[in-house]
């Protein structure tokens, strides 16, 4: 994150104010203030990770992933008893993304489900959409398989298994 001296001064002052307004987190804000004032670029990346940007294309892709899970869940509900026994129900749960390596994606999913009220049927579980392992590439393979299905919202057990195994 490159900043001019003026931007660093403004941000430093913001952190100083935050440390005074939020005494419980004062130590954290003072640390951020020191990082910004002294221009420690390695640590400034840490500050940037919370303020990064997700492209419009990636936002749409995340929504597509969530829509795919919605379609799989609805398809499962329409299966007859014989077919439903061929599908591992646990794999129908949308796990989210890895907070360690895909934090912005986790935050976006939380924004969509909490602030925007989308996909209320998704169980956020104990981990609140933190899959605890990188998932984006897996979801991309699943999306590619799902998009090849002729009836994306009326999938059979075989198609569901193919998507899971992508």
From Swiss-Prot:
Note the SUPFAM superfamilies from the entry.
YfbU-like
Q: Which InterPro entries match?
A: UPF0304_YfbU, YfbU_alpha-helical_sf, YfbU_helix-hairpin_sf
Q: Cystine bridges: which residues?
A: none
Superkingdom of the organism of origin: Bacteria
Sorted alphabetically, which Gene3D superfamilies does this protein's record hold? Answer: Helix hairpin bin, yfbu gene product, domain 2
Query: What Pfam family is a match for this entry?
Result: YfbU
Family recorded in the similarity comment: Belongs to the UPF0304 family.
The name on file for this protein is UPF0304 protein VV2347
Q: Where does this protein come from, organism-wise?
A: Vibrio vulnificus (strain YJ016)
Its ancestry begins with:
Bacteria, Pseudomonadati, Pseudomonadota, Gammaproteobacteria, Vibrionales
């Amino acid at each position: 994150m490159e900043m001019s001296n003026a931007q660093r001064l403004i941000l430093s002052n913001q952190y100083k104010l935050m440390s005074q307004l939020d005494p419980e987190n004062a130590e954290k804000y003072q640390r951020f203030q020191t990082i910004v004032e002294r221009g420690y670029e390695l640590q400034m990346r840490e500050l940037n990770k919370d303020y990064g940007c997700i492209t419009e294309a990636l936002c749409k892709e995340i929504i597509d992933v969530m829509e795919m899970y919605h379609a799989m869940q609805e398809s499962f509900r329409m299966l007859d008893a014989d077919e439903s026994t061929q599908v591992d129900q646990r794999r129908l749960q949308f796990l989210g993304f890895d907070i360690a390596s895909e934090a912005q994606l986790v935050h976006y999913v939380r924004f969509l489900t909490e602030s925007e009220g989308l996909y209320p049927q998704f169980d956020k579980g104990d981990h609140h959409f933190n899959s605890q392992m990188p998932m984006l590439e897996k979801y991309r393979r699943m999306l590619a398989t799902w998009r090849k299905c002729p009836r994306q919202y009326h999938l059979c057990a075989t198609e569901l298994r193919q998507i899971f195994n992508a």
